[in-house]
Amino acid sequence: MLETEGFIQKVKGKKSIVLEKKNLENISLTSIQTVQELNKLQNINLETDLISLYIVQGDKKLMKKFQVSESADFYKVVRTNSLNGEVLNYSTSFFDRKIVPFLNEEIAKKSIYEYLEKDLKLKIGYSRRDINFRKITPEEQKYLKLKDINMVVVIETHAYLSNGTLFQYETIIHHPEKFTFTVIAKR
């Protein structure tokens, strides 16, 4: 597992080589982890705050992303993650209600993925992540409170079930001074 995650390299006839130490400032882009899993793995206490949870109907951009008709509706979940009282990221997630028919405040505060996997018995397969940088919006600034910084790191995620069905579209706005993302490249 450590080898497939890119943390060690096994060399035949030799000891394993540690490639990186995973910590909060060095989060892998190659795995899908919940806040609870990250807390346990790194022995930290990231806290999730729910800002809003409501249903969105007939949004043309979302319908195009999810490749669905106008009758489709989605849950919109806006949250922040904090460490020691400092907001590290601001996320906006959309879940297809045909796949995720019910969400409430308790689930959104705890772990949506745990609910999907354990209660709904969905098999989460993979995600596509696009990383870009842009100017911060007033809404994001309200929560991230960047002083002299007007740019943010944006990770746009399309998450799919194991059968290839898109069930979540998310943008996570990261405080640019609080995270370093790492991918181990192999030849």
Language-model segment annotations:
Residues 1-18:
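N-terminal helix-turn-helix
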Residues 22-187:
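All-alpha effector-binding/dimerization core of bacterial HTH-type transcriptional repressors
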